[in-house]
Every structure is written in structure tokens, then in C-alpha cells.
């Protein structure tokens, strides 16, 4: 299984 994304990806605005 894919490793959990934590912390979640942050998208720069």
C-alpha cells in the first residue's frame, strides 16, 4: 500500500 500522506501536501497560493 502507498505510504500515508502525513502531513498532507501543501499547495502554495
Curated annotation (Swiss-Prot):
Localization of this protein: Secreted
Gene Ontology CC terms, in alphabetical order: extracellular region
Keywords: Amphibian defense peptide, Pyrrolidone carboxylic acid, Secreted
Coiled coil: none
Tissue specificity note: Expressed by the skin glands.
Domain of life: Eukaryota
UniProt keyword annotation of Membrane present: no
Name of a matching Pfam family: Tryp_FSAP
GO biological process: defense response
InterPro entries documented for this protein: Tryptophillin
Keyword Secreted: yes
Pyrrolidone carboxylic acid: residues bearing it: 1
Family to which the UniProt record says this protein belongs: Belongs to the frog skin active peptide (FSAP) family. Tryptophillin subfamily.
The protein, known as: Tryptophyllin-T3-2
Amino acid at each position: 500500500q502507498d505510504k500515508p500522506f502525513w502531513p498532507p501536501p501543501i499547495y502554495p497560493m
